[in-house]
Amino acid sequence: MFSKFFSLQKAFAAARRRLLILILVLGMAGYAWGPALAARQIPPVALSPTESITFTEAQLARGKQLFNRACAQCHVGGQTYPNPDVTLKLSDLEGATPPRDNVLAIVDYIKNPVTYDGVESLVEYHPNTQLLSEYPRLRNLTDEDLKLIAGYILVQAKTVPGWGGTKSESHSDLSAYL
């Protein structure tokens, strides 16, 4: 009887050791893979009509910082306060003439803004890199800075619910934009 009891006790001890080893291995794997699994999946965006690009978290953070400094006065949450009918949501960017749904097209617009239908130049009116006296925030931005801003806009348009939507949609969670 005692030998049976000790055999069961040994079996339980072995099972307990195996369980502890399994828990330890899974815990270490979770610790090692956790940050990668928790990281936001950044979708690729169009660099041009024929090429795509995937920005890193660091690039998007810099793009966000530049956007907030140079663009957010009029484009909080992807809206356009002077003209709420034309926003920074993807469907509006796609519908412009020429389409502004890629990084290089947004960079071109920031440098040489035109009306939504592409007919008239807005260089004299809309903030841009050429309008030196009226809007200095864009003045010293490099092409790389402009690409980061454009990437931030496009990733937001793809991933943030309400980006460029109505006031209640866009402002339901301001933490996504700040």
Swiss-Prot record:
Signal peptide: 1-38
Subunit-level organization: PSII is composed of 1 copy each of membrane proteins PsbA, PsbB, PsbC, PsbD, PsbE, PsbF, PsbH, PsbI, PsbJ, PsbK, PsbL, PsbM, PsbT, PsbX, PsbY, PsbZ, Psb30/Ycf12, peripheral proteins PsbO, CyanoQ (PsbQ), PsbU, PsbV and a large number of cofactors. It forms dimeric complexes.
Disulfide bond sites: none
GO molecular function, one term: electron transfer activity
Protein name: Photosystem II extrinsic protein V
Co-factor note (free text): Binds 1 heme c group covalently per subunit.
Family recorded in the similarity comment: Belongs to the cytochrome c family. PsbV subfamily.
The keyword Thylakoid appears for this protein: yes
Main location: membrane
This protein's encoding gene: psbV
Recorded GO CC terms: photosystem II; plasma membrane-derived thylakoid membrane
Function: One of the extrinsic, lumenal subunits of photosystem II (PSII). PSII is a light-driven water plastoquinone oxidoreductase, using light energy to abstract electrons from H(2)O, generating a proton gradient subsequently used for ATP formation. The extrinsic proteins stabilize the structure of photosystem II oxygen-evolving complex (OEC), the ion environment of oxygen evolution and protect the OEC against heat-induced inactivation. Low-potential cytochrome c that plays a role in the OEC of PSII.
Compartment(s): Cellular thylakoid membrane
